[in-house]
């Protein structure tokens, strides 16, 4: 098991298009923390996945599992504070599960994936806090359309609904393992210089006061 680090670890969770990356970026700048972003742009499978989920579901999930494991190992080894855009736990409990349940990941692939996840997760430091952002499927569709990623044009509202149901079930389960805060972004706007964003920053500063900066550990060989 990893040694107990001294830096803070905040994870931002939530459905596609809910605003995780923007919030991660803004909080990192406001708090002076390091940010780890979801590896979307570099993902070699994402475009193909949205065209043919059944063909690429397992490949995509293994890629995300690998990348997020490496990121979380780095976070666990460091003494500085980090914010992570989407957690490794969402890969397992939201995306892989939903893809399997809707028939896009076979039983054998799903079982192999979950077995690998269970092994890897045991080596990881858990977040100090998971901030779960939620929004209605209609809001998510609007935000996805607004950011205009070519690979996301085929996302359906029904897929977002399925993911949302999986998120709601997982969050109830996760409360027994992690500290969790839920923000309904339809009701509590965090985009832009809102009072809600200011209040969130102040609350995080209160809960996680600044630490004396320490150097990051050397990069792990890849």
Q: How would you describe each model-predicted region?
A:
Residues 15:
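P-loop (Walker A) phosphate-binding loop of NTP-binding proteins
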């Amino acid at each position: 098991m990893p040694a107990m680090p001294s830096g803070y670890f905040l994870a931002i969770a939530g459905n596609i298009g809910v605003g995780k990356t923007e919030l991660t970026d803004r909080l990192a700048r406001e708090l002076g923390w390091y940010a780890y972003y979801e590896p979307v742009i570099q993902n070699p499978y994402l475009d193909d996945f949205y065209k043919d989920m059944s063909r690429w579901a397992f490949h995509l999930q293994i890629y995300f599992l690998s990348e997020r494991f490496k990121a979380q190992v780095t976070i666990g080894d460091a003494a500085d504070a980090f914010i992570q855009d989407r957690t490794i736990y969402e890969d397992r409990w939201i995306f892989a599960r939903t893809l399997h349940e809707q028939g896009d990941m076979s039983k054998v692939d799903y079982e192999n994936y979950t077995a690998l996840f269970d092994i890897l997760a045991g080596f990881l430091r858990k977040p100090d806090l998971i901030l779960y952002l939620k929004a209605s499927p209609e809001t998510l569709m609007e935000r996805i359309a607004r950011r205009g990623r070519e690979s996301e044009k085929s996302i359906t509202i029904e897929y977002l609904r399925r993911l949302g149901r999986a998120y709601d079930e997982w969050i109830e389960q996760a409360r027994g393992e992690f500290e969790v805060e839920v923000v309904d972004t339809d009701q509590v706007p965090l985009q832009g210089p809102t009072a809600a964003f200011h209040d969130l920053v102040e609350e995080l500063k209160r809960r996680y006061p600044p630490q004396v900066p320490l150097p990051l550990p050397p990069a792990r060989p890849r």
